[in-house]
């Protein structure tokens, strides 16, 4: 018999060798039908896993992230099986679950047109109706290679050969006639994939490397309820309209050219947006007691060896040789910040020391992974490093969370907090880890905030808080991080003199609030659908004279608004006023000021507000005061 601890701490006795699926069935048919996977002693497993020792068991449904991944991973197998049934010559590459869905890469000459995708979907529905059980089995590497070679799956053979020689068995899942190289977990049978949709097809290089063959990637999503699928597809259509790559082009914000894949060009409107965002960042950080530094973009190899990046991150770094010495363009700002701290001695009276840096970093990403501003090869990280004593830790964490609250609320973004704890591969004393982790939890709890635990997902040098932002479409974006670090101060031998006159090692917080300026611009562009709040809009006011004879008055109004600090332009083209209004609406200008005979005679302007339309004639000074108050309060509308 085995003792299994269930949800709520209840311990029940079961027969040795019982599967998680059988446990779920014993607890109720509702749970059994909803089960997608399980977690045994914190490790995600297949529901068919036999339990032969005392353990803690969690049954995972689609409401759990790992449950979603299991169901969507199974959906990717159903997709691959359908393609192989219809096109036996297709070669399979990889097909993981991803955020909000799944994909599968195929090497096939047949183009996956919308008509072909419909045909594949129909075959998938047949496979779902067949309720094929997913059965896990293992082979020695040699047997696995033989099986895949026999099936002509050259990409699978390549993957297996990478694991051969490690002394590990190779796991497969079988559903009907289909065998797939996979570690799992999966739902019990294909009938659980109740609601799914193939959403698009794109090209993707094998392993994301442009030197490799271009494959066809089919994207899809899957849910347990049709209603949830329909809601998601509606959101997806709205997201397409808000795509920051599309809006970036239409609004003149940024572009990415063939001459620099992954290296964004910011255009005039984009620079106004970017600089306004950075000005706000600086204003907030000054109020919260931060000083700002700037460290070189390129530093020599010895620094990166000392920080550990040369050994653990070199494949993502751009390197060069200067005067026979290896240099690297910085992928992170931290090591430079350590050197600044070490420039002068510090006393406990100097701490906490909060140092911010808007540092341009470069990281090599595979070409297949690049995506607008969301995944680039160079970006500005809004870093800060806080050097403190152990007893200042909780107060500093709270201070950072308060700063995050202020910044995110300005953009109308809510968040969820995730606490990532000590991984198996970690450095440092476990007592220090326990203290740091409990301090993180206590700080957010005392502030009345909820959090979830992400067991074992901390960095090797310390636990962290991750802030997952929710946008206007309900999508989540991981932007803010508060990362405790007990190791980098040790590597760089950072010190301060304590009240006892002795040398002590400070503790450090790495933190970012926006994460990457470029990525955050992408996020808020989609969040606001390009209709930025007045304070953030690249062009705040557009003056529209009805005809040429009102141009002089329009230019006078423009000068007055410009002197008051508003970002304003005049549309002097000889076009009908309706055309000018429609174009300003397409450009998502917050305010249009219409000028005709009546406005010139009365010294007023007729105001059209984005989203509201005509709000009437007002005096220029009155409009300026209202707009400046709106900007100062950073209102969202």
Question: Where are the model-predicted features located?
Answer:
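NTP/phosphate- and nucleic-acid-binding module
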Residues: 1-73, 78-93, 98-637
């Amino acid at each position: 018999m085995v003792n299994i601890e269930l949800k709520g701490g209840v311990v029940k006795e079961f027969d040795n060798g019982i599967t998680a699926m059988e446990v779920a069935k014993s607890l109720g048919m509702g749970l059994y039908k909803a089960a997608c996977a399980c977690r045994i002693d914190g490790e995600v497993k297949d529901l068919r896993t036999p339990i032969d020792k005392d353990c803690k068991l969690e049954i995972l449904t689609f409401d759990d992230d790992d449950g979603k991944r299991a169901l969507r991973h199974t959906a990717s197998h159903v997709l691959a099986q359908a393609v192989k049934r219809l096109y036996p010559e297709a070669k399979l590459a990889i097909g993981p679950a991803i955020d909000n869905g799944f994909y599968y890469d195929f090497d096939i000459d047949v183009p996956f047109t919308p008509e072909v995708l419909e045909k594949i979907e129909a075959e998938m529905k047949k496979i779902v109706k067949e309720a094929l059980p997913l059965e896990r089995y293992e082979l020695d590497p040699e047997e696995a290679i033989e099986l895949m070679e026999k099936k002509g799956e050259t990409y699978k053979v390549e993957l297996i050969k990478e694991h051969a020689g490690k002394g590990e068995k190779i796991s497969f899942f079988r559903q009907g006639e289909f065998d797939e190289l996979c570690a799992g977990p999966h739902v019990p049978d294909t009938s659980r994939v109740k609601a799914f949709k193939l959403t698009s097809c794109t090209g993707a290089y094998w392993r994301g490397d442009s030197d490799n063959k271009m494959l066809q990637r089919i994207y899809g999503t899957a849910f347990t309820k049709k209603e949830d699928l329909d809601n998601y597809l509606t959101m997806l259509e709205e997201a397409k309209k808000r795509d920051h790559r599309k809006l970036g082009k239409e609004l003149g914000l940024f572009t990415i050219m063939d001459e620099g894949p992954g290296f964004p060009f910011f255009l005039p409107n984009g620079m106004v947006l970017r600089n306004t965002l950075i000005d706000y960042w600086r204003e907030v950080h000054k109020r919260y007691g931060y000083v700002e530094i700037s460290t070189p973009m390129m530093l020599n190899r010895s620094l990166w060896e000392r920080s550990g990046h040369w050994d653990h991150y070199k494949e993502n770094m751009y390197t060069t040789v200067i005067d026979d010495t290896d240099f690297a363009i910085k992928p992170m700002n931290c090591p430079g910040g350590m050197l600044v701290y070490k420039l002068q001695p510090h006393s406990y009276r100097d701490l906490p020391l909060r140092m911010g840096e808007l540092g341009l970093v470069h990281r090599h990403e595979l070409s297949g992974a690049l995506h607008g501003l969301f995944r680039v090869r160079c970006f500005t990280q809004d870093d800060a490093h806080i050097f403190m004593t152990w007893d200042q830790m909780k107060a500093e964490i709270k201070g950072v969370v308060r700063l995050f609250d202020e910044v995110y609320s300005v953009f109308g973004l809510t968040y969820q907090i995730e606490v990532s704890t000590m991984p198996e591969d970690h450095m440092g004393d476990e007592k220090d880890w326990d203290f740091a982790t409990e301090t993180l939890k206590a700080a957010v709890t005392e502030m009345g905030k909820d959090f979830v635990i992400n067991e074992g997902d901390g960095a090797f040098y310390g636990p962290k808080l991750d802030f997952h932002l929710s946008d206007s479409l309900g999508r989540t974006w991981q932007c803010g991080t508060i990362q405790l670090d007990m190791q980098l101060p040790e590597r760089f031998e950072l010190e301060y003199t304590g009240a006892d006159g002795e040398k002590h090692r400070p503790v450090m917080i790495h933190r970012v609030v926006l994460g990457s300026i470029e990525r955050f611009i992408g996020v808020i562009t989609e969040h606001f659908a390009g209709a930025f709040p007045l304070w953030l809009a690249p062009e705040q006011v557009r003056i529209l004279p009805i005809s040429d004879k009102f141009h002089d008055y329009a230019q006078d109004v423009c000068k007055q608004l410009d002197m008051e600090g508003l970002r304003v332009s005049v549309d002097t083209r000889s076009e009908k006023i309706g055309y000018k209004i429609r174009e300003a609406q397409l450009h998502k200008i917050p305010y249009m000021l219409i000028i005709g005979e009546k406005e010139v005679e009365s010294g007023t302007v007729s105001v059209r507000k984005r989203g509201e339309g005509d709000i009437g004639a007002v005096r220029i000074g009155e409009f300026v005061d209202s707009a400046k108050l709106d900007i100062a309060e950073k209102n969202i509308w």
